[in-house]
Curated annotation (Swiss-Prot):
The presence of a 'disulfide through disulfide knot' structurally defines this protein as a knottin. Residues 20-43 form a propeptide. Disulfide bonds join 49-63, 56-69, 60-105, 62-80. GO terms for molecular function: ion channel regulator activity; toxin activity. Keywords: Disulfide bond, Ion channel impairing toxin, Knottin, Secreted, Signal, Toxin. The keyword Transmembrane helix does not apply. This is U32-theraphotoxin-Cg1a.
Amino acid sequence: MKHCFLILFTLIVFTVVWSLEENEEYPDEDEMIESFMDGYSYRGDDGTCILKGDHCHGTCDCCGWTTTCRKSKSAGGKICKSEGSSISAFNAIAKGVAAMKKAKCKHKSG
């Protein structure tokens, strides 16, 4: 019985370490969104659209892609930061809705 526990424990530790190393190879979700938004501007024609990374005072919304206006020490003020649930299913639903809204938005190359 003792050997079974040790084998099971070793497998669990190995699996956790392997999954952590695997995730480091891929860019962070926020980095992917940021790089995508660097290439395209989803700002409205009147320039009222506020995106992630922009300085803000209140809300951050652009064609349904909503983020939160939060204080940032590194940026020297408040900037729009992404927001999400720790439960990935909720994130997938929220991002799907945002993508549908964003698809209706006019976009132009930045």
